[in-house]
UniProtKB/Swiss-Prot annotation:
Keyword Zinc appears in the UniProt entry: yes
Cellular compartments per GO CC: RNA polymerase II transcription regulator complex; transcription regulator complex
Domain of life the protein comes from: Eukaryota
Domain description: Composed of three domains: a modulating N-terminal domain, a DNA-binding domain and a C-terminal ligand-binding domain.
Gene name of this polypeptide: RXRG
Zn finger residue spans: NR C4-type: 143-163, 179-203
Region (Modulating): 1-142
Keyword Transmembrane helix: no
Ranges annotated as spanning the membrane: none
The protein, known as: Retinoic acid receptor RXR-gamma
Spans annotated as Hinge: 209-232
Chain spans, region Disordered: 214-237
Cited InterPro entries: NHR-like_dom_sf (IPR035500), Nuc_recep-AF1 (IPR021780), Nucl_hrmn_rcpt_lig-bd (IPR000536), Nuclear_hormone_rcpt_NR2 (IPR050274), Nuclear_hrmn_rcpt (IPR001723), Retinoid-X_rcpt/HNF4 (IPR000003), Znf_hrmn_rcpt (IPR001628), Znf_NHR/GATA (IPR013088)
Coiled coil region boundaries: none
Length: 467
């Protein structure tokens, strides 16, 4: 009955490897979309680039949402600074796109400046003229690496915060990159995340000094021995304040809660839950881009991480939102779904697990927003997601979140030495529940009895491949 549709679904780990036909509008592999910037807190809007071979034959052409960036048919995730759109296709393994992103490779060691040779196509390397260094003209400096606005002189070169952080992480972690093209990739403000190999070589070619990073690290280590622990806690590269800001920025304003039996909703709790999930997918990309260093990853890796963890990220959010309600969950739409309604709809088992293993535990320990944000960031930075070009970098970011969360709990709750461990124990339950919820969603989609909205449907139709 599904033979006329081109896409296949392969279930995530735990569901077997049998492909299941799914209904889907055929999408041209060459179609692409770009995500506009967020204005006044509203969601990003999509617009077709001029070089797209044809318009995407989908209602999403007229509906703006950053979620359309989540893979085929979600074409691109563009960072808030306007990263260049990347065309995706269904031919690449795991993530269904074709890219030229770098991957770590021991054959291309660029860990020392002696290995660097002049790159073709690097403009003005030998005759770069910097503006004056007076305080009044500092804002006029541009980044020598990508042309973005410079924040000052870093490691010997005027550069932006993005290139400064990229160079520092590369040196401190001794990262090794490769170029999938001819080692002459254009590095500018829009495409600086496309090739880490060429970006790093340009940093060195423009005069950034490895030893400056190493000296800075040694100096910070010595200072830390003489300074008291920061009141905010955690890593300076992963401040808990930024994680909290991300949570607060996307939290729906549910001032007036309503019941599932009101006229504004259907009587089917599954339909209400699916509608709420679809609505929250609008804000998921916006949230992720506010998490420190997520936008520094390649666009391909951003897509992979969001598609690998979207269900767990949404479940964690509505579970924490539900600690204030009795025997039910509170959806982003403001609807309160009762336990009895879930049982009558045939999803009582998984609903009870959400209440007992997540909502109840969060309520008992009074988990705050900062802790929730850290747990969600840990879920986001999943180094085991299939197809990542730089899993070691993702793992390093996850470890930074671990350190931030541990420092935060020690500083905020010194009388609870086991709080950090209790928080981490919610992650296996969240993972298990997330997989079971996916199983239910696939079932409801296939039997066709439950209306599933556009964006959630497309997320279900292009899951990660299991290898």
């Amino acid at each position: 009955m599904y033979g006329n549709y081109p896409h296949f679904i392969k279930f995530p780990a735990g569901f077997g490897n049998s492909p299941v036909h799914a209904s889907s509008t055929s999408v041209s592999p060459s179609s692409s979309l770009s995500v506009g910037s967020t204005v006044d807190g509203h969601h990003n809007y999509l617009e077709a680039p001029t070089n797209a071979s044809r318009a995407l034959p989908s209602p999403m052409n007229t509906i703006g949402s950053p979620v359309n960036a989540l893979g085929s048919p979600y074409r691109v995730i563009a960072s808030s600074i306007g990263s260049h759109p990347v065309a995706l296709s269904s031919s690449a393994p795991g993530m269904n796109f074709v890219t030229h992103s770098p991957q770590p490779n021991v054959l291309n060691n660029v860990s020392s400046s002696e290995d660097i040779k002049p790159l073709p196509g690097l403009p003005g390397i030998g005759n770069m003229n910097y503006p004056s260094t007076s305080p009044g003209s500092l804002a006029k400096h541009i980044c020598a690496i990508c042309g973005d606005r410079s924040s000052g002189k870093h490691y010997g070169v005027y550069s932006c915060e993005g290139c400064k952080g990229f160079f520092k992480r590369t040196i401190r972690k001794d990262l090794i990159y490769t170029c999938r093209d001819n080692k002459d990739c254009l590095i500018d403000k829009r495409q600086r995340n496309r090739c880490q190999y060429c970006r790093y070589q340009k940093c060195l070619a423009m005069g950034m000094k490895r030893e400056a990073v190493q000296e800075e690290r040694q100096g910070s280590r010595e200072r830390s021995e003489n300074e008291a622990e920061s009141t905010s806690g955690g890593s300076e590269d992963m401040p808990v304040e930024r994680i909290l800001e991300a949570e607060l920025a996307v939290e729906p304003k549910t001032e007036a809660y309503s019941d599932v039996n009101t006229e504004s909703s259907t009587n089917d709790p599954v339909t209400n839950i699916c509608h709420a999930a679809d609505k929250q997918l609008f804000t998921l990309v916006e949230w992720a881009k506010r998490i420190p260093h997520f936008s520094d990853l390649t666009l391909e890796d951003q897509v992979i991480l969001l598609r690998a963890g979207w269900n767990e990220l949404l479940i964690a959010s509505f579970s924490h939102r539900s600690v204030s309600v009795q025997d039910g969950i509170l959806l982003a739409t403001g609807l309160h779904v009762h336990r009895s309604s879930a049982h009558s709809a045939g999803v009582g088992s998984i609903f009870d697990r959400v209440l007992t293993e997540l909502v109840s535990k969060m309520k008992d320990m009074q988990m705050d927003k900062s802790e929730l944000g850290c747990l969600r960031a840990i879920v986001l930075f999943n180094p085991d997601a299939k197809g990542l070009s730089s899993p070691s970098e993702v793992e390093s970011l996850r470890e930074k979140v671990y350190a931030t969360l541990e420092a935060y709990t020690k500083q905020k709750y010194p009388e609870q030495p086991g709080r950090f461990a209790k928080l981490l124990l919610r992650l296996p339950a969240l993972r298990s529940i997330g997989l079971k919820c996916l199983e239910h969603l696939f079932f409801f989609k296939l039997i066709g009895d439950t209306p599933i909205d556009t964006f959630l449907m497309e997320m279900l139709e292009t899951p990660l491949q299991v290898t």
